[in-house]
Structures are given as structure tokens and as C-alpha cells.
């Protein structure tokens, strides 16, 4: 997320890149207002079209709209900021992030929640971290294809369960 202020409120903006001009929708209120981008008026040079049809809805991956190289820089910055609390000279000790060969379908583990609503009973997906609603996904772009396949096989057959995990070999 990136932060913004509006009428004295601090906003955590998901789906935006620092410096962009965007329209947002407030989806939750904690100490800050939690917002999702609904329209990009002036995009950042590192913005890309993400592949995920559930982007921002499931709240799982938050960088899919950013070029991969920039994602690595952002993630390195997050790690540095956390570690600076413990070591003021951390900048000199952290190497560059080693990029992965795979930009998608790399995760080999997932934990899914199972729907208890009558309409979707036994189907599974992810819980949105802000709305706490189950998002029934059709496919997760960052999950290994074996996980997507197994989740689809199990769909509709999970009555009585609340969660389950899948882990697959990547070989």
C-alpha cells in the first residue's frame, strides 16, 4: 500500500503507486482509512496491467500492478525499514534481492477458507483482510498450477470444513 492524506484523514491506498493520481473507494476504517484504487488518472512509469482477475478483491497479492523489478526494490525497502529499528547500519549489510525466474505460479503452499453460506457451501477461497468476506477465486496467478487444480477438484465437496491447506512439490 501507499499512504495519502485527505481532509485530515490518513489513507492506506491499495492498488496505487506512490506519486500517482487515483480515485479510491473506502473499504474499511481502522486508525487509517483503508482504500482500493478504482481509477488511475495519472499512472506511475512502473505500473503494469496485472494478470489477476481477483486483484484487490481477495487482498492477497498487493504488488501485481507494479513492474517486477520495482516490486523487488519496494520489498527490500520494507525489510530495511523494519531492521533499522534494530541496526542503524543495516543499509550496508543487505544485498540486492535475487530475482526469481518465475513471476507467476511460484507459491507451493496455500491456506483456503471454506464457505458456510447456503449459496456457496463447500466452496473455498481467500478471506479479504479488510471486509472479512470470503472471495471464491477461480484461479490464483501466484499459486502453483497444481494448487489451483487441486482447489478446483475440492470445490463444492468441503461441507463441514472451515479451512484447509494445500502444499505441493514444485519438482
Question: What is each of the regions a protein language model found here?
Answer:
Residues 1-171:
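Accessory RNA-recognition modules of RNA-modification enzymes
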Amino acid at each position: 500500500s501507499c499512504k495519502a492524506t485527505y481532509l485530515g484523514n490518513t489513507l492506506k491506498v491499495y492498488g496505487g503507486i506512490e506519486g500517482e493520481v487515483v480515485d479510491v473507494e473506502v473499504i474499511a476504517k481502522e486508525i487509517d482509512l483503508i482504500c482500493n484504487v478504482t481509477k488511475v488518472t495519472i499512472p506511475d512509469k512502473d505500473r503494469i496491467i496485472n494478470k489477476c482477475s481477483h486483484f484487490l478483491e481477495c487482498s492477497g497479492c498487493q504488488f501485481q500492478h507494479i513492474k517486477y523489478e520495482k516490486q523487488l526494490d519496494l520489498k527490500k525497502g520494507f525489510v530495511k525499514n523494519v531492521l533499522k529499528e534494530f541496526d542503524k547500519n543495516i543499509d550496508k549489510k543487505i544485498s540486492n534481492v535475487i530475482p526469481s525466474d518465475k513471476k507467476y505460479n511460484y507459491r507451493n503452499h496455500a491456506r483456503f477458507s471454506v464457505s458456510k453460506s447456503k449459496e456457496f457451501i463447500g466452496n473455498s477461497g481467500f478471506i479479504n483482510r479488510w471486509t472479512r468476506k470470503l472471495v471464491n477465486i477461480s484461479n490464483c496467478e501466484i499459486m502453483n498450477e497444481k494448487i489451483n487444480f487441486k482447489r478446483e477438484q475440492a470445490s463444492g465437496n468441503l461441507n463441514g470444513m472451515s479451512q484447509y491447506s494445500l502444499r505441493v512439490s514444485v519438482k
